[in-house]
């Protein structure tokens, strides 16, 4: 059975109470990957996957998920600034649909507006060279996306 693809809050209802999540930042050339601790408090970068073909990319992501005992994915959804969905969102949703056929782990979609810009500003402020930024930007964007999702889930859990 294919994985569920849901907004983050709905997906959280399908994840167990504990367990790591993998955060994904889809780029055209790379996929940034981050992982949470099992208590879902902290996101850490683990890899930038150079995109090849969908099957190879998906196999690598599934191997990373298995190696970290992940129970789900958080996929950054690149909405336009006005909240509308453009071509990048359509591409991300297509990736999610294809990826969901290969796993049963629920996929939570999380608004990633400005994630790459925020990460780039932070890297520039820390005097990271342009060449180094190009290599690590997607992984750091995945950390930013996943940490934002974890913080939102923690806020909801405290409200319960």
From Swiss-Prot:
Coiled coil: none annotated. Keywords: Cytoplasm, Hydrolase, Nuclease, Ribosome biogenesis. GO terms for biological process: rRNA 5'-end processing. Belongs to the YqgF nuclease family. Its main location: cytoplasm. One of its GO terms (molecular function) is nuclease activity. This is Putative pre-16S rRNA nuclease. SUPFAM superfamilies: Ribonuclease H-like. One of its GO terms (cellular component) is cytosol. NCBIfam families: RNAse_H_YqgF (TIGR00250). SMART domains: YqgFc (SM00732). The keyword Nuclease applies. Its EC number is 3.1.-.-. The keyword Hydrolase applies. Could be a nuclease involved in processing of the 5'-end of pre-16S rRNA. It comes from Rhodopseudomonas palustris (strain HaA2). Pfam families: RuvX (PF03652). It is found in: Cytoplasm.
